[in-house]
Amino acid sequence: MEFVTGGTGLVGRYLVAELLAGGREVRLLCRPQSDRKALLRFLDHRGLDDQRVEWCEGDLLDGSFMEEAIAGCSRVYHLAAVVSFHPKDAQHMMRVNRDATRILVNAMLHVGVEELVHLSSVAALGRVTGEPVHEEVPFESGPNVTAYAHSKFESELEVWRGQEEGLKVLTLNPTVILGAGDFNRSSSALFAMVYKGLKWHPTGSNGFVAAHDVARACHVLGDQKCWGKRYLLNAENRSYQSVFDQMADDFKVPRPSRPVKPWMMGAVWRLS
Protein backbone atom coordinates (compact mmCIF):
# COMPACT_ATOMS: atom_id res chain seq x y z
CA MET A 1 0.00 0.00 0.00
CA GLU A 2 1.32 3.43 -0.97
CA PHE A 3 0.00 6.69 0.48
CA VAL A 4 -0.65 9.76 -1.66
CA THR A 5 -1.48 13.30 -0.59
CA GLY A 6 -2.82 15.68 -3.23
CA GLY A 7 -4.10 12.76 -5.29
CA THR A 8 -7.05 14.67 -6.74
CA GLY A 9 -4.83 17.49 -7.98
CA LEU A 10 -3.12 18.14 -11.31
CA VAL A 11 -0.11 15.83 -10.81
CA GLY A 12 -1.83 13.63 -8.25
CA ARG A 13 -4.39 12.18 -10.64
CA TYR A 14 -1.62 11.16 -13.03
CA LEU A 15 0.38 9.64 -10.17
CA VAL A 16 -2.58 7.61 -8.93
CA ALA A 17 -3.10 6.35 -12.49
CA GLU A 18 0.62 5.55 -12.77
CA LEU A 19 0.61 3.56 -9.53
CA LEU A 20 -2.55 1.63 -10.39
CA ALA A 21 -1.20 0.81 -13.85
CA GLY A 22 1.86 -0.59 -12.10
CA GLY A 23 -0.27 -2.92 -9.99
CA ARG A 24 -0.02 -0.93 -6.75
CA GLU A 25 -2.67 -0.35 -4.12
CA VAL A 26 -3.16 3.30 -3.19
CA ARG A 27 -4.43 4.93 -0.02
CA LEU A 28 -5.48 8.42 -0.99
CA LEU A 29 -5.82 11.33 1.42
CA CYS A 30 -8.68 13.65 0.54
CA ARG A 31 -10.54 16.53 2.10
CA PRO A 32 -14.34 16.44 2.50
CA GLN A 33 -14.65 18.93 -0.38
CA SER A 34 -12.26 17.09 -2.72
CA ASP A 35 -13.67 16.25 -6.15
CA ARG A 36 -13.49 12.47 -6.05
CA LYS A 37 -15.72 12.09 -9.10
CA ALA A 38 -13.24 13.93 -11.32
CA LEU A 39 -10.47 11.52 -10.34
CA LEU A 40 -12.72 8.50 -10.83
CA ARG A 41 -13.65 9.74 -14.33
CA PHE A 42 -9.96 10.28 -15.06
CA LEU A 43 -9.13 6.71 -14.01
CA ASP A 44 -12.10 5.22 -15.84
CA HIS A 45 -11.07 7.02 -19.04
CA ARG A 46 -7.74 5.16 -18.78
CA GLY A 47 -9.38 1.81 -18.09
CA LEU A 48 -8.06 1.62 -14.53
CA ASP A 49 -9.79 -0.17 -11.66
CA ASP A 50 -10.52 2.23 -8.81
CA GLN A 51 -11.25 -0.71 -6.49
CA ARG A 52 -7.57 -0.58 -5.50
CA VAL A 53 -7.99 3.00 -4.28
CA GLU A 54 -8.70 3.38 -0.57
CA TRP A 55 -10.07 6.83 0.27
CA CYS A 56 -8.89 8.37 3.51
CA GLU A 57 -10.77 11.54 4.47
CA GLY A 58 -9.07 13.90 6.88
CA ASP A 59 -6.81 16.85 7.59
CA LEU A 60 -3.09 17.06 6.79
CA LEU A 61 -2.65 19.36 9.78
CA ASP A 62 -3.98 16.76 12.24
CA GLY A 63 -0.95 14.83 13.47
CA SER A 64 -2.85 12.03 15.20
CA PHE A 65 -5.00 11.47 12.14
CA MET A 66 -1.96 11.40 9.85
CA GLU A 67 -0.28 8.74 11.98
CA GLU A 68 -3.35 6.53 11.63
CA ALA A 69 -3.71 7.32 7.93
CA ILE A 70 -0.19 6.30 6.89
CA ALA A 71 0.13 3.28 9.20
CA GLY A 72 0.93 0.14 7.23
CA CYS A 73 2.03 1.98 4.08
CA SER A 74 5.42 1.35 2.50
CA ARG A 75 5.89 4.79 0.93
CA VAL A 76 4.39 8.28 1.01
CA TYR A 77 4.07 10.53 -2.03
CA HIS A 78 3.53 14.05 -0.70
CA LEU A 79 1.99 16.17 -3.47
CA ALA A 80 -0.54 18.26 -1.55
CA ALA A 81 0.23 21.99 -1.65
CA VAL A 82 -1.33 25.39 -2.07
CA VAL A 83 -0.18 27.45 -5.06
CA SER A 84 -1.01 31.15 -4.96
CA PHE A 85 0.65 34.46 -5.70
CA HIS A 86 -1.94 36.53 -3.86
CA PRO A 87 -0.56 38.21 -0.70
CA LYS A 88 -3.65 37.27 1.30
CA ASP A 89 -2.83 33.58 0.88
CA ALA A 90 0.72 33.76 2.26
CA GLN A 91 -0.10 32.56 5.78
CA HIS A 92 -2.37 29.78 4.53
CA MET A 93 0.33 28.58 2.12
CA MET A 94 2.87 28.42 4.91
CA ARG A 95 0.51 26.34 7.04
CA VAL A 96 -0.29 23.85 4.29
CA ASN A 97 3.04 23.72 2.48
CA ARG A 98 5.43 23.93 5.42
CA ASP A 99 3.51 22.99 8.56
CA ALA A 100 1.65 20.06 7.03
CA THR A 101 4.94 18.70 5.70
CA ARG A 102 6.42 18.91 9.20
CA ILE A 103 3.42 17.06 10.61
CA LEU A 104 3.67 14.39 7.91
CA VAL A 105 7.40 13.88 8.48
CA ASN A 106 6.84 13.57 12.23
CA ALA A 107 4.04 11.07 11.67
CA MET A 108 6.25 8.96 9.41
CA LEU A 109 9.04 8.95 11.98
CA HIS A 110 6.63 7.99 14.75
CA VAL A 111 4.90 5.07 12.99
CA GLY A 112 7.91 3.81 11.02
CA VAL A 113 7.02 4.59 7.40
CA GLU A 114 10.47 5.21 5.94
CA GLU A 115 10.12 6.29 2.27
CA LEU A 116 9.05 9.81 1.28
CA VAL A 117 8.81 11.20 -2.26
CA HIS A 118 8.19 14.94 -1.95
CA LEU A 119 6.94 17.12 -4.79
CA SER A 120 8.55 20.52 -4.34
CA SER A 121 8.98 23.26 -6.97
CA VAL A 122 11.59 25.07 -9.02
CA ALA A 123 10.56 28.05 -6.87
CA ALA A 124 12.46 26.46 -3.96
CA LEU A 125 15.75 26.59 -5.88
CA GLY A 126 18.16 29.50 -5.83
CA ARG A 127 19.02 31.80 -8.72
CA VAL A 128 22.37 33.06 -10.02
CA THR A 129 22.17 35.85 -12.58
CA GLY A 130 23.27 34.66 -15.99
CA GLU A 131 23.35 30.97 -15.07
CA PRO A 132 20.79 28.20 -15.64
CA VAL A 133 18.78 27.15 -12.62
CA HIS A 134 20.00 23.86 -11.15
CA GLU A 135 19.64 21.77 -8.01
CA GLU A 136 22.83 22.92 -6.29
CA VAL A 137 22.11 26.65 -6.16
CA PRO A 138 21.19 27.55 -2.54
CA PHE A 139 17.91 29.33 -1.94
CA GLU A 140 18.17 32.98 -0.95
CA SER A 141 15.43 35.34 0.13
CA GLY A 142 14.98 38.66 -1.62
CA PRO A 143 12.45 41.29 -2.69
CA ASN A 144 11.35 39.28 -5.74
CA VAL A 145 11.02 35.94 -3.94
CA THR A 146 7.37 35.00 -3.54
CA ALA A 147 5.61 33.72 -0.45
CA TYR A 148 4.96 30.54 -2.41
CA ALA A 149 8.71 30.06 -2.96
CA HIS A 150 9.39 30.58 0.75
CA SER A 151 6.72 28.04 1.68
CA LYS A 152 8.08 25.39 -0.69
CA PHE A 153 11.66 25.97 0.43
CA GLU A 154 10.68 25.64 4.08
CA SER A 155 8.69 22.50 3.32
CA GLU A 156 11.85 21.04 1.79
CA LEU A 157 13.75 21.86 4.98
CA GLU A 158 11.27 19.67 6.86
CA VAL A 159 11.85 16.84 4.38
CA TRP A 160 15.64 17.04 4.72
CA ARG A 161 15.25 17.21 8.49
CA GLY A 162 13.32 13.96 8.21
CA GLN A 163 16.24 12.43 6.34
CA GLU A 164 18.60 13.41 9.14
CA GLU A 165 16.26 11.67 11.58
CA GLY A 166 16.11 8.43 9.61
CA LEU A 167 13.74 8.74 6.64
CA LYS A 168 14.62 7.87 3.05
CA VAL A 169 13.63 10.93 1.03
CA LEU A 170 13.88 12.50 -2.39
CA THR A 171 12.49 15.76 -3.73
CA LEU A 172 11.39 16.73 -7.21
CA ASN A 173 11.44 20.36 -8.31
CA PRO A 174 9.33 20.79 -11.45
CA THR A 175 9.08 23.96 -13.49
CA VAL A 176 5.62 25.20 -14.59
CA ILE A 177 3.42 22.09 -14.77
CA LEU A 178 0.84 21.81 -17.54
CA GLY A 179 -1.78 19.12 -17.98
CA ALA A 180 -5.45 18.20 -17.90
CA GLY A 181 -7.02 19.29 -14.66
CA ASP A 182 -9.40 21.65 -12.89
CA PHE A 183 -9.19 24.95 -14.79
CA ASN A 184 -9.89 26.80 -11.54
CA ARG A 185 -6.78 25.49 -9.79
CA SER A 186 -3.02 25.79 -10.03
CA SER A 187 -1.34 26.24 -13.41
CA SER A 188 -4.39 24.78 -15.17
CA ALA A 189 -6.01 28.17 -14.57
CA LEU A 190 -3.79 29.50 -17.38
CA PHE A 191 -5.85 27.53 -19.88
CA ALA A 192 -9.10 28.94 -18.52
CA MET A 193 -7.87 32.53 -18.68
CA VAL A 194 -6.68 32.18 -22.27
CA TYR A 195 -9.94 30.48 -23.24
CA LYS A 196 -11.92 33.34 -21.68
CA GLY A 197 -10.03 35.92 -23.72
CA LEU A 198 -7.00 36.94 -21.64
CA LYS A 199 -5.48 39.98 -23.33
CA TRP A 200 -2.06 39.99 -21.63
CA HIS A 201 0.93 37.71 -21.76
CA PRO A 202 4.13 37.88 -19.70
CA THR A 203 7.37 38.83 -21.37
CA GLY A 204 10.35 36.54 -20.99
CA SER A 205 10.40 32.77 -20.75
CA ASN A 206 10.17 29.88 -18.32
CA GLY A 207 10.54 26.14 -18.12
CA PHE A 208 7.51 23.92 -18.68
CA VAL A 209 6.88 20.24 -17.98
CA ALA A 210 3.90 17.91 -18.47
CA ALA A 211 1.99 16.70 -15.42
CA HIS A 212 2.16 13.08 -16.58
CA ASP A 213 5.96 13.31 -16.82
CA VAL A 214 6.17 14.67 -13.27
CA ALA A 215 3.99 11.82 -12.01
CA ARG A 216 6.09 9.29 -13.89
CA ALA A 217 9.26 10.73 -12.35
CA CYS A 218 7.77 10.47 -8.84
CA HIS A 219 7.01 6.79 -9.39
CA VAL A 220 10.22 5.78 -11.19
CA LEU A 221 12.65 7.65 -8.95
CA GLY A 222 10.95 6.25 -5.87
CA ASP A 223 11.12 2.71 -7.23
CA GLN A 224 14.77 3.18 -8.16
CA LYS A 225 15.48 4.21 -4.55
CA CYS A 226 17.09 7.52 -5.48
CA TRP A 227 17.13 8.61 -1.86
CA GLY A 228 18.90 11.73 -0.73
CA LYS A 229 18.60 13.32 -4.17
CA ARG A 230 16.94 16.44 -5.56
CA TYR A 231 15.72 16.53 -9.17
CA LEU A 232 14.86 19.55 -11.29
CA LEU A 233 12.16 18.49 -13.77
CA ASN A 234 11.86 20.44 -17.01
CA ALA A 235 10.81 19.46 -20.53
CA GLU A 236 11.66 22.64 -22.41
CA ASN A 237 12.15 26.37 -22.04
CA ARG A 238 9.61 28.45 -23.93
CA SER A 239 8.65 32.08 -24.09
CA TYR A 240 5.41 32.83 -22.29
CA GLN A 241 4.10 34.37 -25.50
CA SER A 242 4.64 31.19 -27.51
CA VAL A 243 2.90 29.06 -24.86
CA PHE A 244 -0.06 31.42 -24.57
CA ASP A 245 -0.28 31.68 -28.36
CA GLN A 246 -0.37 27.89 -28.68
CA MET A 247 -3.14 27.68 -26.09
CA ALA A 248 -5.16 30.35 -27.89
CA ASP A 249 -4.69 28.71 -31.29
CA ASP A 250 -5.84 25.34 -29.94
CA PHE A 251 -8.90 26.98 -28.38
CA LYS A 252 -9.47 28.99 -31.58
CA VAL A 253 -9.64 32.26 -29.65
CA PRO A 254 -7.65 35.49 -30.14
CA ARG A 255 -4.07 35.39 -28.92
CA PRO A 256 -3.12 37.49 -25.86
CA SER A 257 -1.37 40.47 -27.42
CA ARG A 258 -0.46 42.90 -24.64
CA PRO A 259 2.94 42.23 -23.05
CA VAL A 260 3.46 42.80 -19.34
CA LYS A 261 6.40 42.08 -17.05
CA PRO A 262 6.20 38.63 -15.41
CA TRP A 263 6.07 40.15 -11.91
CA MET A 264 2.90 42.03 -12.94
CA MET A 265 1.03 38.88 -13.96
CA GLY A 266 -0.15 38.22 -10.41
CA ALA A 267 -2.20 41.40 -10.56
CA VAL A 268 -3.40 40.59 -14.08
CA TRP A 269 -4.56 37.11 -13.03
CA ARG A 270 -6.42 38.49 -10.02
CA LEU A 271 -8.22 41.00 -12.25
CA SER A 272 -9.03 38.52 -15.03
Labelled PLM ranges:
Residues 90-91, 95-148, 170:
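Conserved Rossmann-fold NAD(P)-dependent oxidoreductase catalytic core, especially the SDR/UDP-sugar
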Residues 154, 185-186, 202-222, 228-229:
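Substrate-positioning beta->alpha
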Residues 217-272:
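Mid/C-terminal beta-alpha module of Rossmann-like enzyme folds, strongest
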Residues 2-22:
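N-terminal Rossmann NAD(P)H-binding glycine-rich loop of SDR-like oxidoreductase domains
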Residues 47-99:
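NAD(P)H-binding glycine-rich loop region in Rossmannoid oxidoreductase-like domains
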Residues 120, 157-180:
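Conserved beta-loop-beta element that borders a ligand/cofactor-binding pocket
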Residues 85, 122-131, 177-182:
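Conserved catalytic-site region of short-chain dehydrogenase/reductase
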Residues 144-147, 175-183, 200-212:
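Glycine-rich "substrate-gating" loop/helix at the edge of Rossmann-like oxidoreductase active sites
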